[in-house]
Structures are given as C-alpha cells and as structure tokens.
C-alpha cells in the first residue's frame, strides 16, 4: 500500500510504502530509491485498487515502469462480493468486518511520517485478510484448479489495466459546444417550465381553523370570533356543536413543474396508472416501499406517455424531462472537465464482468435520441487522432449459446445463422409477429416493430437470470399476465438454459 499527498492527478510526493509477504511482519519504506529497488525486483504485487492508483502513482513519482504481475483485490471484491453496496468495497469497510479499524487522516501534507506509515500498515493488514478471504473463495469456485484461476486473474488484470489506461488518457471535451448546449438548454428548460405552469392545475393552499376559546359574550350573545366560527361551520355543513378542526382553502398557488408530488398529483387526475416503480427496502424492518416513477433513464415512462392521448399537455412534460436530463449531462461534462478532458471512470463490474461507469460518461443517449448528436459530439479526438470503437455482437446471447449447444444443437445452429435476431424470434414464438413481419423489419419497411423488439429484448436477457412475471411487468409496463405469457414463451423456446444450469 502507498500513501501520498494527494490523489493520482495531483500527487507530488509519496509519504511511504508498506508491505508484507506473510501477514505477520510488516515493513515500511520512506526512501524513494529503496522503493524503486524493492518494487522492481517483485514478480507479483497484491493491492487494493493497485492497478488504477498505487502502480500509476509509483510510476509517476518514482519514474519507473512496474513489470510485476498485479493482483487487485478491489475488482476481485466486485466479482465475489456482488451483494455489497458500492461504497462497501473499500478497505475501511472491510476493516470493520475484519476488526482492523482503518486510521483516519485529514491532513495529507503536514503530519509526521509515522502517522502516514501507521495508516499504510493498517491498510496492508486489512488487505492481507481480504486477499486470503478472496483467494479461498476463488479456489473453491475453481475446484482448486490454480492454472484455471490464474487465467481468470490474468483476464481481470488485463481488463482493469484497460480501465486504468482509459482513465489516465481521458477523453477530450469540446468545452465550447458543452457550454453552448448548457446555455441553450437552460433557456429552453425555463420556457418549458413556464409552459407547463399554464397547463398544470394550480396548487390548493389550505390552513386549519380551530374553535375559538370564547364564542359567546357574557350576556350570552355570539361574539365576533364565535360568529366567524359558526359561519365557517355552516359553509362546511357541520353542526353548530362541532368543535374539531376545519380545513379551509387559503388560496391558490402557481403549480411547480419541478415538484415531483405536484406532477404526480396532476398525472393521477388524468387517470395515470403507474407501472414502473422504485423499490426502497427498510434495512431494519425488511419492508419494501413501492414508489411510482414518472421518469426512467431521462425519459417519461410508458405509462405516462399513454396520457398524451388523453391530455396533449403531458407532451410538454415529456419535453421538459428530456431537456432536464440532457442539461444534466452537459453540466456534468463541464463539472468534471479538467484541462479540456473528462475521465471515463469505472465504479464496479456487472455480473457479466462488464464495467459499471461513473459520471459523467455513463448512460449517454444515442445519436438517434434528442440531443444525442450534441452529447456525443462533445467527445472528440485530439488533433492528429481519430476516434474509433468496437463492440461484440450479442455477447451474453453468444455465451448462452455456448452452454446450450450440447442440449439443443438444432436451436443453436438456427441462432447462428446470419440475420437471426433472438428478440424477434422470441416475439414470433410468442405469436406476436410472423416471419414475414421480421423480413419486412430487416428490409426497413416495418420500423414500428422496433418498440416490440425492445420489450422482447428485455425478456430475453432478464429471463436468463430468472426474472419473475411481477418484476418483468414493472420493467416493461405490461400487465403481469402478459409478462407471464412472454416468460412461458421464452422458457418453451430456451428450455436448455434451465437444463445446463441445473446440471452445474
């Protein structure tokens, strides 16, 4: 483990380097030349985020090139500890688990070297325990086949080194275009808010009235306070002896399109039936709270879009939603920009070992979406360079075919033919479209099938991981019966997926 005076980009000094080779004896180095001599003779180094921080830092400050094999316990934890929250993969969190508290330090420039060394050693202690824990579990998964496990570790090292290289290189940002888009969208957003205020219902402002202490004068006649109270009861058709609270309308405020509650109240008044929810689980009680969602991934959910037919004013909300989302992207570019570049950082791995990305380069709209060309256009190549990209076709589906082949070779052969679309094939198998419809779609004469394909794509991928009808219903907006029908069609067609899973 290494402690420095700042994060990688701004670090100018390494305070110390601590290490152990047996989990019992811990050493700390303060001298730069001793660090060089130590690092350059190592065949393997184990560290937490060592690929993306410690090694780049050592190479930057010491002017060396580390050639040792790198075993990074951070991505290893992402792989095995997939149920841990994103912020629970750090050494501080594991220190709590292992009973080795991570020392806190707020000043990274002026403390004694021993203070930094103490923290550094404790980090090494925590990481030693984490490494032993991870290694034991990996060996169990790989049936103690160390050669096979080493292949996986090499792959993981390569993958994270690619991420480290991307983060170090950065992505050149067209700052001028980003600022121009922020200015334009800010103006348009304000206009949309004003427009939406004219179509949303005004908000009722209420106050609570209570019975006055004195309703009658000494002579028995009604007091002025009593008179107002009894008139209020008459207005609300309440008996004169009523002495509870009365809610009255105080006035009407202009609607606030930025208020989630007010927007939802408006949609409910139009007959909105939510289909997309966010589920918040109470950690203490285990109870799940279902929160209706108006937006998802920067767009209105399908159940809200349906209301445009009932009230075209909902289209204004759709426009505002897109503007807000795109504005946040461009603003994120500018917030994260440094010397004309933004970082393509990662924040974890999915269960298929894909990267989870961090702001600002995450979930960017395609060029076929509103403002997609401008968003992508902000990411440019330096002078003399060309941007290029590569992707694998149907990575998960291809992996699935590999395991299905021994059980259902005929279906795998069919899926391997040029032009085969697993999502449209499932739609055909479910009776939603015909082969001629698919042919017309491929020829560009049935673009309307694209939305249908999108739903069946969700089914194809989520069903493989055991999704149930209720959750699929929430994800697609269809009812539970329709979702179950699609799942039935999927498993009838992909029975071999269960077969090879059960055989493991």
PLM feature spans:
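Conserved "right-hand" nucleotidyltransferase catalytic core of DNA-directed polymerases
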Residues: 3, 102-105, 113-373, 380, ...
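Metal-dependent catalytic core segments for phosphate chemistry
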Residues: 12-16, 396-433
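Short, Lys/Arg-enriched anionic-surface-contact patches
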Residues: 440-453
């Amino acid at each position: 483990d290494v402690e420095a005076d700042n994060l990688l980009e701004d670090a100018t000094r390494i305070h110390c380097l601590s290490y152990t080779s047996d989990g019992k004896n811990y050493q700390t180095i303060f001298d730069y030349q001793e660090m060089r001599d130590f690092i350059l003779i190592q065949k393997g180094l184990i560290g937490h985020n060592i690929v993306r921080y410690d090694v780049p830092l050592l190479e930057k400050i010491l002017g060396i090139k580390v050639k040792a094999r790198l075993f990074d316990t951070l991505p290893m934890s992402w792989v095995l500890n997939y149920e841990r929250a994103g912020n629970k993969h750090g050494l501080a969190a594991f220190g709590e688990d292992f009973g080795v508290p991570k020392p806190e330090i707020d000043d990274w420039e002026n403390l004694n070297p021993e203070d930094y060394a103490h923290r550094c050693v404790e980090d090494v202690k925590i990481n030693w325990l984490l490494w032993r824990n991870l290694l034991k579990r990996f060996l169990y998964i790989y049936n103690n086949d160390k050669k096979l496990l080493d292949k996986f570790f090499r792959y993981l090292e390569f993958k994270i080194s690619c991420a480290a290289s991307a983060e170090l290189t950065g992505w050149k940002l067209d700052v001028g275009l980003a600022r121009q888009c922020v200015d334009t969208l800010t103006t348009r957003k304000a206009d949309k808010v004003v427009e939406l205020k004219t179509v949303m219902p005004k908000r009722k402002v209420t106050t609570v009235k209570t019975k006055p202490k004195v309703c009658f004068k000494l002579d028995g006649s009604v007091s002025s306070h009593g008179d107002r109270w009894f008139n209020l009861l008459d207005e609300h058709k309440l008996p004169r002896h009523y002495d509870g609270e009365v809610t009255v309308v105080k006035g009407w405020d202009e609607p606030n399109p930025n208020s989630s509650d007010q927007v939802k109240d408006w949609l409910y008044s139009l007959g909105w039936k939510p289909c997309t929810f966010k589920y918040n689980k109470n950690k203490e009680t285990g109870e799940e709270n279902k929160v209706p969602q108006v937006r998802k991934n920067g767009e209105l959910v399908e159940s809200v879009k349906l209301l445009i037919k009932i009230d075209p004013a909902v289209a204004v909300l759709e426009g505002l939603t897109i503007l807000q989302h795109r504005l946040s992207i461009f603003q994120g570019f500018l917030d994260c920009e440094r010397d004309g570049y933004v970082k393509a950082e990662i924040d974890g791995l999915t269960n298929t070992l894909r990267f989870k990305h961090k702001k600002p380069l995450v979930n960017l709209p395609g060029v076929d979406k509103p403002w997609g060309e401008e968003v992508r256009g902000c990411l440019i190549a330096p002078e003399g360079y060309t941007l290029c990209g590569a992707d694998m076709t149907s990575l998960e589906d291809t992996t699935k075919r590999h395991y299905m082949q021994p059980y259902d070779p005929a279906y795998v052969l069919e899926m391997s033919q040029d032009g085969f679309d697993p999502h449209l094939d499932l739609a055909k198998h479910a009776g939603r479209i015909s082969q001629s419809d698919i042919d017309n779609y491929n020829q560009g004469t049935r673009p309307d099938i694209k939305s249908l394909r999108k739903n069946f794509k969700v089914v194809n991928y989520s069903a493989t991981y055991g999704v149930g009808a209720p959750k699929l219903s929430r994800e697609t907006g269809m009812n539970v019966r329709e979702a179950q029908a699609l799942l039935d069609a999927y498993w009838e067609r992909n029975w071999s997926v269960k077969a090879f899973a059960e055989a493991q």
